[in-house]
C-alpha cells in the first residue's frame, strides 16, 4: 500500500511537471501576442501615422469632426463639389455597390438619366459628363473624383461662392493627388479635402 501511494504521488508530480510548462507557455504567448504585440503595434502606428491611425478625420476651426478623408458624404447646395453617386447612400454601415451587370437595362437607364441631370446642372453637353459623376463606386464610399469630374463643377461652385474660375481651378489642382508611388492608379481629387479647403477659404474672407 505504501509503495502504491508513493507511485501515485510520483505520477501526480510528473503530471504537474508536464502541465506547468504548457500553462506558462500558453499564458506567456497570450500576454505577448494578445497584449504586448497589440499595444506595441498601436503605439508605433500612432507615433508614425497619427492622422491616419485616427481615421484621417477632418475637423473644422473649432475642432469638431466633420467627416473623414476616406469616406465620401453628400453635400447640400451648389456651393460644394459633389462626389460620386452611392448605392449605399454614403452610409458606411451599408457600404455596397449596386451589383448591376453592365448588360442590365436598368443600369443603362439610370446612367442615361444621371448623365442628363448632371449635364443640365453643370450646363455642359451630355458627352462631356465624366463617367465617375454618373457611376457608383464598388463600395459606395469613394471620396475621390477624377480631375475632369472636379473641373466640370468649377463653374457652378465659383458662381455660387463668388470666386473666380482660375482661383478655384488652382484649388482643385492643389488637391489633386498623383499616382500612388508614381505608378499605381490615376490622378484623383479628394472631394472631402477639397470641400474642407472651400470652408477654410470662406472663413478667411
Residue ranges with predicted function:
Residues 2-17, 21, 25-26, 33-34, ...:
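Flexible, solvent-exposed loop/hinge segments and secondary-structure transition points
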Residues 156-205:
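Extracytoplasmic/periplasmic C-terminal soluble domains
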Amino acid at each position: 500500500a505504501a509503495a502504491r501511494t508513493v507511485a501515485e504521488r510520483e505520477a501526480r508530480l510528473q503530471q504537474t511537471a508536464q502541465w506547468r510548462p504548457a500553462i506558462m507557455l500558453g499564458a506567456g504567448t497570450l500576454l505577448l501576442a494578445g497584449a504586448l504585440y497589440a499595444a506595441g503595434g498601436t503605439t508605433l502606428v500612432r507615433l508614425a501615422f497619427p492622422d491616419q491611425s485616427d481615421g484621417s478625420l477632418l475637423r473644422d476651426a473649432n475642432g469638431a469632426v466633420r467627416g473623414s478623408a476616406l469616406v465620401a458624404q453628400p453635400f447640400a447646395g451648389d456651393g460644394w463639389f459633389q462626389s460620386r453617386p452611392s448605392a449605399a447612400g454614403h452610409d458606411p454601415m451599408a457600404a455596397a455597390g449596386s451589383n448591376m451587370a453592365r448588360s442590365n437595362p436598368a443600369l443603362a437607364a439610370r446612367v442615361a438619366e444621371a448623365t442628363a441631370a448632371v449635364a443640365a446642372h453643370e450646363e455642359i453637353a451630355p458627352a462631356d459628363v465624366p463617367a465617375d459623376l454618373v457611376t457608383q463606386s464598388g463600395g459606395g464610399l469613394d471620396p475621390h473624383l477624377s480631375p475632369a469630374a472636379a473641373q466640370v463643377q468649377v463653374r457652378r461652385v465659383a458662381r455660387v461662392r463668388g470666386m473666380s474660375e482660375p482661383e478655384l481651378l488652382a484649388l482643385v489642382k492643389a488637391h489633386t493627388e498623383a499616382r500612388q508611388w508614381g505608378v499605381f492608379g490615376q490622378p484623383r481629387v479628394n472631394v472631402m479635402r477639397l470641400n474642407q479647403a472651400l470652408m477654410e477659404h470662406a472663413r478667411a474672407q
